[in-house]
Amino acid sequence: MKVVAFERQEQGTGASRRLRNAGKTTGIVYGGEAAPQKIELDHNALWHALKKEAFHSSILDLEVAGQSQQVLLRDVQYHPFKQLVLHVDFQRVDAKKKLHTKVPLHFLNAEVSPAVKLSSAVVSHVATEIEIECLPSALPEFLEVDLSKIEAGQSLHAKDIALPKGVALVAHIDAENPVVASATIPAGAVSDAAGEGETPAA
């Protein structure tokens, strides 16, 4: 995805306010061997781009003053109650160095799982994203979590996710192996099932 930005000359709270009034959002690009670079972006274009999942988890081509560089979106600051982006941070990407970043999880096939079809269980998505490490060229936009075999009372963990070639869980996630999805039978369904099994009193 391509992002167009402009070099920002003015600094300070007053300058940021003037830029916002002009429909601009402030930002910064950092990382790599180059010095941090202050930028400004068109607010409306940025606002719509931020609605796309891929904008948060893909390598972006950021063009500033005619020069293109590969970056990752690292932070977004929103106004507390207005539909307003106050500031964005981008980190430069080195094609030869592994990066650590979070990618979204897409859950598939819960409706055909034994948990749902046989036990009327509810499958809960405990995590919506997970932190991985890989070279920029191997970065996936998202990871798929196949729920087709989950049974009632079972959980799927981080290590159960099929990872593409060149992608690994970061060390602490690999060690902790957290739950990403679980299948539970609602309390009401358990009570109903127990009631159906009771023998009526004589």
Swiss-Prot record:
<keyword id="KW-0687">Ribonucleoprotein</keyword>
<protein>
    <recommendedName>
        <fullName>Large ribosomal subunit protein bL25</fullName>
    </recommendedName>
</protein>
<dbReference type="InterPro" id="IPR037121">
    <property type="entry name" value="Ribosomal_bL25_C"/>
</dbReference>
<dbReference type="InterPro" id="IPR011035">
    <property type="entry name" value="Ribosomal_bL25/Gln-tRNA_synth"/>
</dbReference>
<keyword id="KW-0699">rRNA-binding</keyword>
<dbReference type="InterPro" id="IPR001021">
    <property type="entry name" value="Ribosomal_bL25_long"/>
</dbReference>
<comment type="similarity">
    <text>Belongs to the bacterial ribosomal protein bL25 family. CTC subfamily.</text>
</comment>
<comment type="function">
    <text>This is one of the proteins that binds to the 5S RNA in the ribosome where it forms part of the central protuberance.</text>
</comment>
<keyword id="KW-0694">RNA-binding</keyword>
<dbReference type="InterPro" id="IPR029751">
    <property type="entry name" value="Ribosomal_L25_dom"/>
</dbReference>
<dbReference type="Pfam" id="PF14693">
    <property type="entry name" value="Ribosomal_TL5_C"/>
</dbReference>
<dbReference type="GO" id="GO:0008097">
    <property type="term" value="F:5S rRNA binding"/>
</dbReference>
<dbReference type="InterPro" id="IPR020055">
    <property type="entry name" value="Ribosomal_bL25_short"/>
</dbReference>
<dbReference type="InterPro" id="IPR020930">
    <property type="entry name" value="Ribosomal_uL5_bac-type"/>
</dbReference>
<dbReference type="InterPro" id="IPR020057">
    <property type="entry name" value="Ribosomal_bL25_b-dom"/>
</dbReference>
<dbReference type="GO" id="GO:0022625">
    <property type="term" value="C:cytosolic large ribosomal subunit"/>
</dbReference>
<comment type="subunit">
    <text>Part of the 50S ribosomal subunit; part of the 5S rRNA/L5/L18/L25 subcomplex. Contacts the 5S rRNA. Binds to the 5S rRNA independently of L5 and L18.</text>
</comment>
<keyword id="KW-0689">Ribosomal protein</keyword>
<dbReference type="InterPro" id="IPR020056">
    <property type="entry name" value="Rbsml_bL25/Gln-tRNA_synth_N"/>
</dbReference>
<dbReference type="Pfam" id="PF01386">
    <property type="entry name" value="Ribosomal_L25p"/>
</dbReference>
<dbReference type="GO" id="GO:0006412">
    <property type="term" value="P:translation"/>
</dbReference>
<dbReference type="GO" id="GO:0003735">
    <property type="term" value="F:structural constituent of ribosome"/>
</dbReference>
